[in-house]
Each structure stands twice: as C-alpha cells, then as structure tokens.
C-alpha cells in the first residue's frame, strides 16, 4: 500500500451518456496536457459490445469486470506518477467509487483530495440523440440510440461529489479550455 502523498499522478475522467463527446473531448484534453488518453470503451469485453449492439443495456454484473480492468490500469498509471485522461460514462456513483479506488490513498467521501477528478459533459436528450443518430449513420460506434434513455435513467451526479459540469452545446475547444481552467483551479486553490 502506498504511503500518503506518494501518488503524484492524476486522472481526469470525462463522463456522461453516450454521444456526449467524451472521446472527442478526452483526446483533445490529453493532447493539451501532453498525456495519455484512455477510452473506457476499449476495455469492454466482446460480449458487452455485442449486447450493446443488440440494444441490450448492460447490467452491473456486466460492468464490474470492465470497471475493475479500468481501475487496475489507472492505479498503475497513478503509482507511476502519470497524468491520464479517461473517457468513461461513469454514470452511477458506485461506478465512480470503483474508479476513485484506483487512488490508493482515496478514502470514500474524500472527493477533493482524490487523484481522480470527474468532469460531466451535460446535454439534454434531444441534443445527444441527434449526435447519436449522426454517429450511427456514419457507423462510428457500437452504442445504439435505443439505449440512450437507459443511460439518462442511470445518470447520477450528486453535488457532494464535486463533479465539474460543462454543457455539450459549447464548442469542443471551449469545453477543453474550460476543463483546463477548472482542473488548474482545483489543483491550486
């Protein structure tokens, strides 16, 4: 177990429903920070991808091995002192707690000292649905529009968690710059 303050790495997790722009923003943010970008979709098993393609929402049983793989990857990077940007839906608090657990010094509820920071890309169902329809027509993703409502139903963003929130209607450049400012301010109060 790491001693307190041995962890020098940081994770900025871009969260939200499918179609919010997590991967686009995450890649841009990773480039701006000169750090690695991880897409949680790359950690999904083939069976999870197949379920989603068929319009079947994942259960917690489906998600747990996926989240644990992500947690393991993040923990290694944090212990190596790396900064990394992660695009991950992170819809429920319990999922975010698993990801926060990648910080060996994290104590449940100590959100401000955790090395994993969450940024929620917020948008209404109509805006996100239009994005998913465009993406589906370009065959760019396995997640169908039919699962969007189930994602909105799962989304939890408790104020006490100190999740940064930003609107998806802003340009990607403005979103990235805003995230950079928010993260800098949170690291240097």
Swiss-Prot record:
CDD domains: GntK. GO terms for molecular function: ATP binding; gluconokinase activity; hydrolase activity. It catalyses: D-gluconate + ATP = 6-phospho-D-gluconate + ADP + H(+). Keywords: ATP-binding, Gluconate utilization, Hydrolase, Kinase, Nucleotide-binding, Transferase. ATP binds at residues 16-23. One of its GO terms (biological process) is D-gluconate metabolic process. Gene3D superfamilies: P-loop containing nucleotide triphosphate hydrolases. Its EC number is 2.7.1.12. Pathway: Carbohydrate acid metabolism; D-gluconate degradation. Phosphorylates gluconate to 6-phosphogluconate. PANTHER family: GLUCONOKINASE-RELATED. Belongs to the gluconokinase GntK/GntV family. NCBIfam families: therm_gnt_kin. This is Gluconokinase.
